[in-house]
Amino acid sequence: MERTQLFDLMGELKLYGMKAAFDEIMTTAVKRQHEPQRIVGDLLNAEINEKQ
């Protein structure tokens, strides 16, 4: 799925924290070869932090 499609879906679901942190989390994940579960966890934590 393209980045723009992901951002559209995150916006539609009102996942603004996840959307804001996406590029940084993905860049770090690629550099450090994070597992998919780690990436999803980091995105979810970004969303939780945004909502608090």
Question: What feature does the model see in each segment?
Answer:
Residues 1-13, 17:
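Charged, compositionally biased N-terminal leader segments and the immediate start
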